[in-house]
Amino acid sequence: MNKQSWLLNLSLLKTHPAFRAVFLARFISIVSLGLLGVAVPVQIQMMTHSTWQVGLSVTLTGGAMFVGLMVGGVLADRYERKKVILLARGTCGIGFIGLCLNALLPEPSLLAIYLLGLWDGFFASLGVTALLAATPALVGRENLMQAGAITMLTVRLGSVISPMIGGLLLATGGVAWNYGLAAAGTFITLLPLLSLPALPPPPQPREHPLKSLLAGFRFLLASPLVGGIALLGGLLTMASAVRVLYPALADNWQMSAAQIGFLYAAIPLGAAIGALTSGKLAHSARPGLLMLLSTLGSFLAIGLFGLMPMWILGVVCLALFGWLSAVSSLLQYTMLQTQTPEAMLGRINGLWTAQNVTGDAIGAALLGGLGAMMTPVASASASGFGLLIIGVLLLLVLVELRRFRQTPPQVTASDG
């Protein structure tokens, strides 16, 4: 029973009722947000026939999410985390109701969509940081890798299902149905979350919120270990922005519309396989080195992706990137939670998640700029190999992360 399997162990859902409640709430929430993610751009495009207006809504929501992550990190370290989670979810649901009512109007308001996008982006991310900060208390730090892998699998599964449901709803009932069901799903998530135990933050001195946030920044910059993890996370997210080149590369490979879907599915599929085969990751004696090497491997996969002579080989490279990035992300998540003091968990999780959001935006902008000067193939390769060079430099510079050793957690009978 003590022999560890490569496959993900789902026993945490059975042994930890609080984590099971979070699992259910997260899955329903991801599906709800997926319905929203399909409806908003479609509605704006139908109203304005402007891709710029669609892009503006995404940018505004992303900006609100960034602010929400910063504020949420401070709140999660100051107030009872269960209350922050419930407040954020409930308030987010009110915004979805607003979008539904607006969609039912004879002439929906574009301004209302933008404002409610700001509202929902802010409050959705507010709850994310509180939930991340509370996870070690819910499952125990020794189970964080397992919890992270289960969460990743949930996110990937929900991200595949929700756009399909959203598309069917748009085809049959219109955007109001998407918004209405997103609101209903969000309020349903409150039911399992109400069963969570009290999650008080650790005692700490009262200080101005900005000063508290700056303390989080200082900790991140002063810690070679935690700061290095956050930096790798940002670079990895930048690499995933290669999806903006898919349409152009599809033309280069002369792919059909049906085949293009394989490009978009490859990274989530690889990541799901990475999560499913993460059973032994928690028992790695040198997680920092493994994180660095898996990140380098993922950059190499992106560099090779655009050079492939056939699209099917490109899909294999993307799936490999998904798998390696999943390994790196799980190690990042676990080390961040275990190496950050309890009193800082909210702020550091907020900053880590925020740099993932900004990393994706920066990566997309850089690839867009490269695409204006180079061919799609050259752009994809330049981004991958450029990040690979930066990664090799970080492998040499981040000595503390590279040499970090941990005592593998003890395997209990329930784990096997």
From Swiss-Prot:
It holds the Pfam family MFS_3. It is found in: Cell inner membrane. InterPro entries: Enterobactin_exp_EntS (IPR023722), MFS_dom (IPR020846), MFS_trans_sf (IPR036259), TM_effector (IPR010290). GO terms for cellular component: plasma membrane. It is a multi-pass membrane protein. Belongs to the major facilitator superfamily. EntS (TC 2.A.1.38) family. This is Enterobactin exporter EntS. It comes from Escherichia coli O157:H7. The lineage of its organism: Bacteria, Pseudomonadati, Pseudomonadota, Gammaproteobacteria, Enterobacterales.
